[in-house]
Amino acid sequence: MDLIEKIDEMLPLYPKCERARETGVLDLNSSNLTVVPPVVFNIMSHAQVKECDISGNLLNNIPPQLALDFQALTKLNISHNFLAILPVEMGNLPALETLDLSSNLFYALPDIVFKLPHLSHLYAQNNFISEFDLSQPIKSDRMNVFDLRYNPLNSSFRIKLVNKYTKFRLVLNEEGVYNEEEQ
């Protein structure tokens, strides 16, 4: 890619990246991105990004560089894309508290969500998740909301999930909220 192509690719994103350098909030939502351009990471290289919103794009993967470069992330919104997997590097986001991966193409919960030590809000609604490994422990002791609405959870798994003792609020379809209080 020559310099002119890089500049053309970056023009609409440059003001957003400059604003993020000042605020710590990178908002690239609804930018018609099919990839997160590497030049974004170059511009943001010395910035401390605490929040990143790349929702409403056309992404089918998240570059591992996001997790490697944005170690201070507390909030990541990757909803409304075409994602089915996440890079393993995302499991190393030590400060991540809120992860929104709703309205994507996930058939299973990515293993990394169980490894995030400070995760308190996980939004995974409107995917294609039918079940996941209930024996895998959630590393975070701060989990507050786990939203699985509008997923085709199979009935036997749903029963196991509802009966599993949790300290967090489990949200499932219109049937209500389960495990809202410690039992």
Predicted regions mapped to residue ranges:
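The feature captures the LRR N-terminal capping module
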Residues: M1-S79, I85-V88, T98, S130-Q183
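Tandem repeat domain/solenoid detector
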Residues: F82-A84, V88, N92-E97, L105, ...
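Extended, charged alpha-helical interaction scaffolds
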Residues: D100-L101, Y107, V113-I129
